[in-house]
Amino acid sequence: PPRARWNEGWDENVKDKETGEIKLVHHPALKHVKENVGTQLNKALEAIEDANVDALQDVLKGINFNRKIGQRTLDDDTLADFVLNFEKIPLKDDDFEFPDLLGSAYEWLIKFFADSAGKKAGEFYTPAEVVRICVEICDPKEDMSIYDPTAGSGGMLIQTRDYLREHGGDPGELSLNGQEKIGTTWSICKMNMLLHGISHADIR
């Protein structure tokens, strides 16, 4: 969507509050934004979600770059540097060593924050080794429907997919379903699924 474009600026018709006249306002490309960066990033995420409702509904709009961290919000310079650093990282599919690289990086971050959170991590994270044992016990097959009533960050469902693929099965023939009552954890789970290339999972 135009509002989320990285390299291209975009134009918007805006109504003047005082005169009522319609004016054409030019917005810079996202990587060139220097003022109100947090607000522009929030709007970019909203635009991406609105353009991909089936996959991203309620996933990105909860992210707020203007939220206080400790006693302050991140300033424009910090956020602008954060945005520009993304340009230094090759993020095209062809640049990845393996298809699930982004998903693996995301899971590493989940584990990192889980280790830092201590007991609170139990709300969204189960160690991968424990999950693997559970999956092996279940021994999923094609045409099965898998349901995780406490999905957390989605590790069980992802490892179920991986297990089937490792054993020569077609993950597309597996029905993945999960439930999570904590909103932020649900968003983490949805994003984890998408970054692992799983768009057909039903997470509620």
Question: What are these model-predicted stretches?
Answer:
Residues P1-E142, R204:
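Non-catalytic, mostly N-terminal accessory regions of nucleic-acid modification and defense proteins
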Residues K120-R204:
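Conserved S-adenosyl-L-methionine
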